[in-house]
């Protein structure tokens, strides 16, 4: 059953990025840069999602540190309920349509 499903949806090529929600992006950057030796590629404001995102490449993948900028955004609610930590993992696949994960 699992093998048939995997054949149908295609192959997961790689982990594209891991989104980690943080309270304070500047403090989190210190940890990821100093303790883990990662380099900051860029910081991006995303008003449409009410977040600031720091991008830290790690080989073929990337860590995204995500800080909410309003208290009523989806990310802020996630942070209030669950605290800092992994918010999402983005996978690169052969054919996104076949995964059944595309929302219209």
What do the predicted segments below correspond to?
Residues 1-8:
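N-terminal amphipathic/basic-hydrophobic helices that include classical n-h-c signal peptides
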Residues 8-9, 76-82:
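Short, flexible, solvent-exposed loop/turn segments with mixed acidic/basic and small polar residues
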Residues 10-13, 20-62, 98-99, 104:
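Core segments of cupin and vicinal oxygen chelate
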Residues 12-15, 86:
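Core-facing hydrophobic residues within beta-strands of well-ordered domains
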Residues 19-20, 67:
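Hydrophobic side chains within alpha-helical segments
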Residues 22-26, 70, 81-104:
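Vicinal oxygen chelate
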Residues 55-57, 67, 92:
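Short, well-ordered beta-strand micro-motif
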Residues 64-77:
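Intrinsic, low-complexity N-terminal interaction/targeting segments
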């Amino acid at each position: 059953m699992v093998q048939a499903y995997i054949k149908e949806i295609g192959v997961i090529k790689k982990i594209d990025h891991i989104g980690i929600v943080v309270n304070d992006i500047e403090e989190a950057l210190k940890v990821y840069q100093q303790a883990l030796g990662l380099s900051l590629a860029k910081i991006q404001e995303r008003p449409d999602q009410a977040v600031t995102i720091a991008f830290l490449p790690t080989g073929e993948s990337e860590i995204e540190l995500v800080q909410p900028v309003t208290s009523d955004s989806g990310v802020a609610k996630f942070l209030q309920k669950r605290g800092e930590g992994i918010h999402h993992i983005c996978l690169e696949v052969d054919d996104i349509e076949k995964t059944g994960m595309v929302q219209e």
